[in-house]
Amino acid sequence: VGCGTGLSLALLRAAVGEQGRIYGFDQSPDMLAQARQRADAAGWRNVELFECPAQSLSLPTPVDAILLHYTHDILRSPLAIDRLLAVAEHGAAVAIAGVKYFPRWLAPLNLWVYLKNHGYNGSPGELTAPWDRIAPHLSDWQIAPTQFGMGYLAFGRVNKSARGKK
Protein backbone atom coordinates (compact mmCIF):
# COMPACT_ATOMS: atom_id res chain seq x y z
CA VAL A 1 0.00 0.00 0.00
CA GLY A 2 1.58 3.25 -1.06
CA CYS A 3 4.56 1.33 -2.46
CA GLY A 4 6.52 4.49 -3.25
CA THR A 5 9.80 3.76 -4.99
CA GLY A 6 9.51 0.04 -4.30
CA LEU A 7 12.15 -0.22 -1.57
CA SER A 8 10.19 -3.04 0.10
CA LEU A 9 9.72 -5.06 -3.09
CA ALA A 10 12.91 -7.12 -2.75
CA LEU A 11 12.01 -8.26 0.77
CA LEU A 12 8.41 -8.95 -0.21
CA ARG A 13 9.60 -10.90 -3.27
CA ALA A 14 11.93 -12.95 -1.08
CA ALA A 15 9.00 -13.74 1.23
CA VAL A 16 6.53 -14.86 -1.47
CA GLY A 17 9.04 -16.41 -3.88
CA GLU A 18 8.45 -16.86 -7.59
CA GLN A 19 5.01 -18.44 -7.13
CA GLY A 20 3.47 -15.69 -4.99
CA ARG A 21 2.11 -12.37 -6.24
CA ILE A 22 2.88 -8.86 -5.12
CA TYR A 23 0.51 -6.00 -5.86
CA GLY A 24 1.86 -2.54 -5.19
CA PHE A 25 0.08 0.75 -5.71
CA ASP A 26 0.84 4.40 -5.32
CA GLN A 27 -0.88 7.56 -6.51
CA SER A 28 2.43 9.24 -7.38
CA PRO A 29 3.47 8.49 -10.98
CA ASP A 30 7.07 9.50 -10.23
CA MET A 31 7.39 7.15 -7.27
CA LEU A 32 5.67 4.34 -9.15
CA ALA A 33 8.01 4.79 -12.12
CA GLN A 34 10.95 4.12 -9.81
CA ALA A 35 9.21 1.05 -8.38
CA ARG A 36 8.53 -0.24 -11.91
CA GLN A 37 12.14 0.31 -12.89
CA ARG A 38 13.27 -1.60 -9.79
CA ALA A 39 10.94 -4.55 -10.51
CA ASP A 40 11.79 -4.62 -14.23
CA ALA A 41 15.55 -4.50 -13.57
CA ALA A 42 15.22 -7.47 -11.22
CA GLY A 43 13.03 -9.39 -13.68
CA TRP A 44 10.20 -9.91 -11.21
CA ARG A 45 7.26 -11.07 -13.30
CA ASN A 46 5.06 -11.63 -10.26
CA VAL A 47 5.08 -7.95 -9.23
CA GLU A 48 2.17 -5.87 -10.51
CA LEU A 49 2.10 -2.13 -9.88
CA PHE A 50 -0.95 0.12 -10.12
CA GLU A 51 -1.18 3.91 -10.23
CA CYS A 52 -4.19 4.86 -8.15
CA PRO A 53 -5.16 6.34 -4.80
CA ALA A 54 -6.11 3.85 -2.09
CA GLN A 55 -9.69 5.17 -2.19
CA SER A 56 -10.22 3.65 -5.67
CA LEU A 57 -8.14 0.49 -5.27
CA SER A 58 -9.32 -2.56 -7.18
CA LEU A 59 -7.21 -5.71 -7.54
CA PRO A 60 -7.58 -8.75 -9.82
CA THR A 61 -7.54 -11.22 -6.89
CA PRO A 62 -7.95 -10.97 -3.10
CA VAL A 63 -4.77 -10.59 -1.07
CA ASP A 64 -3.61 -12.53 1.97
CA ALA A 65 -1.42 -9.76 3.39
CA ILE A 66 -1.28 -5.96 3.41
CA LEU A 67 1.75 -3.82 4.26
CA LEU A 68 1.19 -0.17 5.20
CA HIS A 69 4.58 1.50 5.57
CA TYR A 70 4.36 5.15 6.61
CA THR A 71 0.99 5.68 4.94
CA HIS A 72 -0.62 7.96 7.52
CA ASP A 73 -3.11 9.61 5.16
CA ILE A 74 -4.38 6.23 3.97
CA LEU A 75 -4.93 5.15 7.58
CA ARG A 76 -6.93 8.34 8.21
CA SER A 77 -9.27 7.77 5.23
CA PRO A 78 -12.34 5.62 5.98
CA LEU A 79 -12.87 5.08 2.24
CA ALA A 80 -9.27 3.90 1.75
CA ILE A 81 -9.62 1.51 4.68
CA ASP A 82 -12.88 0.15 3.22
CA ARG A 83 -11.12 -0.47 -0.12
CA LEU A 84 -8.19 -2.24 1.54
CA LEU A 85 -10.51 -4.48 3.53
CA ALA A 86 -12.56 -5.21 0.41
CA VAL A 87 -9.53 -6.63 -1.44
CA ALA A 88 -8.30 -8.65 1.56
CA GLU A 89 -9.18 -12.24 2.34
CA HIS A 90 -10.69 -13.05 5.73
CA GLY A 91 -7.74 -13.50 8.07
CA ALA A 92 -5.33 -11.57 5.84
CA ALA A 93 -2.31 -10.29 7.75
CA VAL A 94 -2.06 -6.51 8.09
CA ALA A 95 1.32 -5.03 9.09
CA ILE A 96 1.68 -1.31 9.72
CA ALA A 97 4.70 0.88 10.44
CA GLY A 98 4.34 4.59 11.01
CA VAL A 99 4.95 7.69 13.02
CA LYS A 100 2.95 8.89 16.00
CA TYR A 101 3.23 11.47 18.73
CA PHE A 102 5.60 10.80 21.60
CA PRO A 103 4.12 9.60 24.90
CA ARG A 104 2.97 12.30 27.35
CA TRP A 105 6.21 12.33 29.29
CA LEU A 106 7.97 13.51 26.10
CA ALA A 107 5.12 15.79 24.98
CA PRO A 108 7.28 18.86 24.29
CA LEU A 109 8.92 16.90 21.47
CA ASN A 110 5.58 16.53 19.70
CA LEU A 111 5.99 19.98 18.17
CA TRP A 112 9.06 18.59 16.40
CA VAL A 113 7.06 15.52 15.25
CA TYR A 114 4.31 17.79 13.95
CA LEU A 115 6.73 20.06 12.07
CA LYS A 116 8.64 17.08 10.67
CA ASN A 117 5.47 15.45 9.31
CA HIS A 118 3.06 18.25 8.40
CA GLY A 119 4.35 18.44 4.82
CA TYR A 120 3.82 14.71 4.26
CA ASN A 121 0.57 14.12 6.09
CA GLY A 122 -2.79 15.66 5.29
CA SER A 123 -3.80 15.21 8.92
CA PRO A 124 -0.68 15.54 11.11
CA GLY A 125 -2.84 16.56 14.04
CA GLU A 126 -4.12 12.98 14.17
CA LEU A 127 -0.83 11.39 15.19
CA THR A 128 -1.92 10.30 18.67
CA ALA A 129 -3.27 6.92 17.50
CA PRO A 130 -3.07 6.85 13.67
CA TRP A 131 -4.22 3.21 13.61
CA ASP A 132 -7.54 3.85 15.38
CA ARG A 133 -9.68 3.67 12.21
CA ILE A 134 -8.34 0.33 10.97
CA ALA A 135 -7.78 -1.46 14.30
CA PRO A 136 -11.52 -2.16 14.94
CA HIS A 137 -11.58 -4.22 11.73
CA LEU A 138 -8.66 -6.41 12.79
CA SER A 139 -8.30 -9.29 15.22
CA ASP A 140 -5.13 -10.37 17.04
CA TRP A 141 -4.21 -6.66 17.21
CA GLN A 142 -0.70 -5.99 18.49
CA ILE A 143 1.18 -2.71 18.62
CA ALA A 144 4.69 -1.85 19.76
CA PRO A 145 6.39 1.54 20.02
CA THR A 146 9.63 2.25 18.13
CA GLN A 147 12.00 5.22 17.94
CA PHE A 148 11.60 6.06 21.65
CA GLY A 149 7.82 6.22 21.22
CA MET A 150 7.70 8.36 18.06
CA GLY A 151 7.06 5.38 15.79
CA TYR A 152 5.09 2.18 15.97
CA LEU A 153 4.81 -1.28 14.46
CA ALA A 154 1.40 -2.92 14.45
CA PHE A 155 -0.07 -6.20 13.30
CA GLY A 156 -3.52 -7.71 13.01
CA ARG A 157 -5.72 -9.94 10.86
CA VAL A 158 -8.76 -8.88 8.84
CA ASN A 159 -12.02 -9.79 10.60
CA LYS A 160 -14.65 -11.62 8.60
CA SER A 161 -17.12 -8.81 9.37
CA ALA A 162 -14.72 -6.26 7.83
CA ARG A 163 -14.85 -7.84 4.37
CA GLY A 164 -17.24 -7.15 1.54
CA LYS A 165 -17.39 -3.34 1.50
CA LYS A 166 -17.06 -3.02 -2.26
Give a label for each model feature.
Residues 91-99:
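Conserved beta-strand signature within the Rossmann-like core of class I S-adenosyl-L-methionine
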Residues 74-84:
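A short, conserved alpha-helix within the catalytic core of class I
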